[in-house]
């Protein structure tokens, strides 16, 4: 679990990744294109889809983002279970 904790804290340690999680938690399912457009327009970020894909890789390694195929698109989904499990020991 320590490795997973480290991965979660690493993922949360970057402000862009936190914005990605904010958007995914707000909208539930987004494609990479939709996520990119939201980040650029809502937060005035200067970021490419490739850079977001790298951030998503870190979030996926931590278990905070999953994806599934919907037709020809890959949809991104926020998974808050790792955060709940991490905090459970401290809060209870």
From Swiss-Prot:
The keyword Transcription regulation applies. Pfam families: HTH_20. Residues 1-92 form the HTH arsR-type domain. Keywords: DNA-binding, Transcription, Transcription regulation. Gene3D superfamilies: Winged helix-like DNA-binding domain superfamily/Winged helix DNA-binding domain. Residues 37-61 bind DNA. SUPFAM superfamilies: Winged helix' DNA-binding domain (SSF46785). The keyword Metal-binding does not apply. One of its GO terms (molecular function) is DNA-binding transcription factor activity. One of its GO terms (biological process) is regulation of DNA-templated transcription. PROSITE patterns: HTH_ARSR_2 (PS50987). NCBIfam families: HTH_metalloreg. This is Uncharacterized HTH-type transcriptional regulator YuzN. It comes from Bacillus subtilis (strain 168).
């Amino acid at each position: 679990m320590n490795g997973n904790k480290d991965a979660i804290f690493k993922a949360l340690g970057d402000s862009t990744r936190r914005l990605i999680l904010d958007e995914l938690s707000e909208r539930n399912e987004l494609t990479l294109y939709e996520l990119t457009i939201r980040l650029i327009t809502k937060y005035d970020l200067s970021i490419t889809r490739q850079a977001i894909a790298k951030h998503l890789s870190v979030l996926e390694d931590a278990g905070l983002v999953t994806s599934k195929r919907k037709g020809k698109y890959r949809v991104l989904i926020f998974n808050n279970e790792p955060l709940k499990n991490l905090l459970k020991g401290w809060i209870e």
